[in-house]
Amino acid sequence: MSYARRSCICGLFLLFLALVCEANSGFIGVKDSHFELNGSPFLFNGFNSYWLMHVAADPTERYKVTEVLKDASVAGLSVCRTWAFSDGGDRALQISPGIYDERVFQGLDFVIAEAKKYGIRLILSFVNQWNDFGGKAQYVWWARNAGAQISNDDEFYTHPMLKKYLKNHIEKVVTRLNSITKVAYKDDPTIMAWELMNEPRDQADYSGKTVNGWVQEMASFVKSLDNKHLLEVGMEGFYGDSIPERKSVNPGYQVGTDFISNHLINEIDFATIHAYTDQWVSGQSDDAQLVWMEKWITSHWEDARNILKKPLVLAEFGKSSRGQGSRDIFMSSVYRNVYNLAKEGGTMAGSLVWQLMAHGMENYDDGYCIVLGQTPSTTQIISDQAHVMTALARSLN
């Protein structure tokens, strides 16, 4: 390829990025149960890449972050969900309560700066239900070491010391001044939303009332620090006691949350659901799993539209990468369902597939890895959904 042609292609790509960034300026808001950007409906297709900050903490590995965000932008993806936590352990952001590794924080700074460059919005989560990257178990361990009497990890939602630890972390993240962009996180529209917790569960109170109290307290605290950004809980979508008949939609069990009551809290701006048929309804055939999946999505869309009156995001879904053909069929079906519901006014706002990675990241692969370009059929399905959702948003304007 000639130098002139390479220069032309590079120039066109930079122009494309400039136009994308200009179109994406401003904060995402909510109006009449749908997302809005600069006065127009906002629909999207997006992805999860939980590892971005963890990898970017090492400057020699930041090219992996750039690769994923660049490839996602080229494919038309516009929202990414990732972690703003790493509590204890390897490359910890929060080494101990209130003590942070600036090197890791600068990794998150880089993630936000790169996302802005490629026109991708971020949903940033504050803490994990699970032990990966610390989670609530790490908070409990810290509190016990400080002398607190805690009987189980689910006291995370009620114990004053644990709630104080989390509030300190939330404030540290929300008020952070980005070392690269020189913009405080709370003032940066690159961030679409904050997430209170990845997949909160409470085995000590299946009614969802304990988690509800915690969500109310934490949501009010976040909004006291930042009323510009949207806020969501991080829910998987399990129904609880508020509408008993809806519990039949659950995959056979409850987890101590209540999709309805937890999302009716005023400070929560939109609802989320997750879905993993390989795990939740593993004994069923692929066809039966697709039927269950459609019912799961549609039931929550009905409730988001009619009861919550808030947008709904399928914030995690995935299919094992062991069978590419079955995964492509599954993803096409899910995307078709999301699109068809989005046509009904935009309450169903988009979906975030789990998960995108860069080349050479096998050690991070949890069985759901997608490398854009490495599996052309899957990449095409993802990109097609991004473009039809963008076109649909324009038609709803």
Swiss-Prot record:
UniProt main location, coarse: secreted
Enzyme Commission identifier(s): 3.2.1.78
Catalytic reaction annotation: Random hydrolysis of (1->4)-beta-D-mannosidic linkages in mannans, galactomannans and glucomannans
Signal sequence range: 1-23
Uppermost EC category: hydrolase
Record: active site: 199, 316
GO CC terms of this entry: extracellular region
Localization terms from the record: Secreted
Keyword vocabulary terms for this entry: Glycosidase, Hydrolase, Secreted, Signal
InterPro entries in the cross-refs: Glyco_hydro_5, Glycoside_hydrolase_SF, MAN-like
GO BP, sorted A to Z: polysaccharide catabolic process
One function term, GO molecular function aspect: mannan endo-1,4-beta-mannosidase activity
UniProt keyword Ligase, yes or no: no
UniProt keyword annotation of Secreted present: yes
Annotated binding of substrate, by residue: 83, 198, 276, 354
UniProt-listed SUPFAM superfamilies: (Trans)glycosidases (SSF51445)
Organism domain of life: Eukaryota
Pfam families xrefs: Cellulase
Family of the protein in this entry: Belongs to the glycosyl hydrolase 5 (cellulase A) family.
PANTHER family: MANNAN ENDO-1,4-BETA-MANNOSIDASE 1 (PTHR31451:SF55), PTHR31451
Protein name as catalogued: Mannan endo-1,4-beta-mannosidase 1
Organism encoding this protein: Solanum lycopersicum
Gene that encodes the chain: MAN1
